[in-house]
């Protein structure tokens, strides 16, 4: 473990757009999928960090599946573990959220924009929240 790594429990790999959140016992790994959505790659026993966890994305052609791209019959939101699935994106499982927009549409599409890793936990003004005394 390199100096200061015990404090840094979130690692981001820019090239693969992968986040690795971990503690002594567990790892939670998510990535930015090729369509900009967040995909959940792994949650379980602690894994050693590596720059590329893309082998955890299950991509294969399946019959009777809706595909995002005509040229890629292996990428389907219906079969990928998404971090926050929404209604109307070719994933027919229950969405995490379904919004009724002013124009009557219920289709939403949230895409990854950016990230910021900060030390500690910001205070939530006027709201109850957990806190840490060590700044970790």
Where are the model-predicted features located?
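N-terminal accessory beta-strand-rich subdomains and adjacent acidic, glycine-rich linkers
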Residues: 3-136
């Amino acid at each position: 473990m390199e100096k200061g790594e015990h404090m840094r429990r979130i690692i981001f790999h820019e090239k693969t757009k992968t986040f690795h959140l971990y503690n002594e016992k567990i790892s939670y790994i998510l990535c930015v999928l090729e369509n900009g959505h967040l995909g959940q790659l792994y949650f379980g026993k602690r894994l050693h960090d590596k720059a590329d966890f893309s082998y955890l994305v299950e991509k294969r052609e399946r019959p009777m599946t809706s595909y995002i791209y005509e040229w890629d019959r292996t990428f389907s939101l219906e079969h990928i573990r998404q971090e926050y699935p929404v209604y109307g994106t070719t994933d027919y499982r229950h969405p995490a959220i379904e919004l009724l927009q002013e124009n009557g549409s219920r289709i939403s599409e949230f895409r990854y924009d950016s990230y910021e890793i900060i030390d500690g936990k910001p205070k939530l003004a006027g709201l109850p929240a957990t806190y840490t005394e060590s700044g970790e």
